Structure formats: structure tokens, C-alpha cells
């Protein structure tokens, strides 16, 4: 009887082990894989409103998404920023930079929407202007610095976001309304009436002048979304800017670069 009882205990143990192995390999692991892939393949739907189409019918944007590792500082990235700054000092002035295609087109859209582009400068113009004045760009963290480099390199105003902070699954590009609440990063509440603005389910998240505190990137950001605003309608240039960002992410943010798509 003792031998039979021992055999039964062994069988029970084997059955339990088989049960848990089955749960692990055929239930838990596939679930974890699906959950990871859903996050990695997450893509927001982006709608360009009739408001924007009416003032800029040739608008073309690019959305870059990637899994990333952010760091406080990257010397190699800043070497690239400084090199580009020196190049611009030799080739541009604070007036001629306004003629860069992406900047000129964004300023034109501002005027069409009723906003003074000299008071609310597009971010790309403000960054390059600061360089030309001999001022150092503000250093934040690697993701912020990288997006700034991509913006000044191509002249487009680019929004960088922590994609996990968006509400809902759709972003709509429209025009800011009077009294619409919007907290710019490091700027407090700003007046976005007449500014092109991306909105999620909750409200505004990004304009060509300033992105919103609510969805900003941080040192803990692992899921990045970047929006390139091509108000000049140059799709090839916008694509090149997106591919440039992907290469920077591979070099400086331990990323495989993610992917991008064009929207109009």
C-alpha cells in the first residue's frame, strides 16, 4: 500500500507540474507577448480638420512612433547640435531663417489663422534664432534634445510626446479657440486662439509654438510619438525628417527606430 500511495503522490505532482507548465507556456507567455506587441504597435489615428485644410490645403504630416530609453544627457548628441549651430551661424541670419520652407509656411498659416508669428514664433524658428544669437539651447534630456535637433535640422516645428499619456485613440489637428485652456511646457497657461493645435479626447496636446505639460516627454518615457508638421506640403522633405529622427533614436535612445506614417 505504501508503494501504491507513493506512486499516486508522484502522479499527482507530475499532473500539477504539467498543469502549471501548460498555464505558463500556453496562457501566460502568449498574453504577455500580445500585451507587449499591442503597446509597441500602438498607432493613434490622426485627423486633419477642415479648419486646417482651408488655410493649408497642401499640409502633410508624419507621425513617428518608437519604444525608447531616455537618459539625462548625451554628449554625442550635443556635439551634433553644436556642429549644426556653427553651420547656421555661417549661412543664416535672424531674418533669412524666416525664408526656410517649413518656417515660412508655418508663419503663413499663423497669419491665416489670425496669429502674429513674430509674437508666437514657431518652435523651429525660435530654436534656430536662439542659436544665431549665440545663446545655448536649453538642455532637458536626451529625447527633448533629440527632437529639438530634428526640428532645427529641417525647419519643421515638431511635437514630441509621451504616447502613453494621450487620452483616447484619436488626435485631431484643428485651430485653437478663444479661452481654450492650454498649459504650455514651462510657460504656464498660454493663449492658443488662432494656433494650429492637436487635440486628444481631453483637449489640446501640441501646437507649433509649444507642446502641453500634460503629454510631455519625461525621463521615464518609454513610448515616444513625434509629429512633424509640414505646412509647406513637401512630403519628400517631411519623410526625410522622419527617417532622420528614426536614425537619431537608434543612435542615442537604444531604440530600433520604430516606424512612421504620413497623414494629410
Place the predicted regions along the sequence by residue:
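Single conserved hydrophobic/aromatic residue that forms the stacking wall/gate
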Residues: 1-12
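Short, positively charged and aromatic/hydrophobic N-terminal segments
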Residues: 14, 28-31, 35
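Generic short amphipathic/hydrophobic targeting helices enriched at N-termini
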Residues: 4, 30, 39-43
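A detector of low-complexity, intrinsically disordered, Ser/Thr/Gly/Pro/Ala-rich segments
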Residues: 12, 16, 41-42
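Charge-biased, low-complexity intrinsically disordered regions
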Residues: 42-264
Amino acid at each position: 500500500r505504501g508503494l501504491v500511495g507513493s506512486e499516486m503522490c508522484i502522479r499527482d505532482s507530475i499532473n500539477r507540474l504539467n498543469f502549471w507548465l501548460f498555464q505558463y507556456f500556453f496562457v501566460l507567455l502568449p498574453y504577455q507577448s500580445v500585451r507587449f506587441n499591442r503597446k509597441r504597435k500602438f498607432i493613434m489615428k490622426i485627423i486633419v480638420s477642415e479648419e486646417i485644410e482651408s488655410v493649408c490645403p497642401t499640409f502633410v504630416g508624419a507621425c513617428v512612433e518608437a519604444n525608447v530609453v531616455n537618459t539625462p544627457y548625451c554628449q554625442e548628441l550635443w556635439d551634433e547640435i553644436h556642429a549644426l549651430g556653427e553651420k547656421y551661424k555661417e549661412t543664416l541670419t535672424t531674418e533669412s531663417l524666416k525664408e526656410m520652407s517649413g518656417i515660412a509656411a508655418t508663419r503663413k498659416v499663423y497669419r491665416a489663422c489670425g496669429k502674429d508669428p513674430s509674437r508666437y514664433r514657431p518652435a523651429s524658428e525660435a530654436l534656430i534664432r536662439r542659436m544665431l544669437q549665440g545663446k545655448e539651447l536649453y538642455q532637458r534630456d536626451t529625447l527633448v534634445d533629440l527632437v529639438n535637433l530634428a526640428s532645427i535640422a529641417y525647419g519643421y516645428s515638431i511635437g514630441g510626446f509621451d504616447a502613453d499619456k494621450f487620452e483616447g485613440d484619436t488626435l485631431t489637428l484643428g485651430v485653437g479657440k478663444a479661452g481654450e485652456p492650454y498649459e504650455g511646457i514651462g510657460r504656464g497657461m498660454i493663449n492658443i486662439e488662432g494656433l494650429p493645435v492637436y487635440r486628444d479626447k481631453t483637449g489640446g496636446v501640441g501646437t507649433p509654438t509649444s507642446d502641453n505639460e500634460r503629454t510631455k516627454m519625461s525621463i521615464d518615457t518609454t513610448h515616444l510619438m513625434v509629429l512633424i508638421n509640414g505646412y509647406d506640403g513637401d512630403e519628400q522633405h517631411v519623410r526625410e525628417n522622419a527617417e532622420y529622427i528614426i536614425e537619431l533614436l537608434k543612435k542615442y535612445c537604444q531604440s530600433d527606430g520604430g516606424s512612421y506614417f504620413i497623414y494629410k
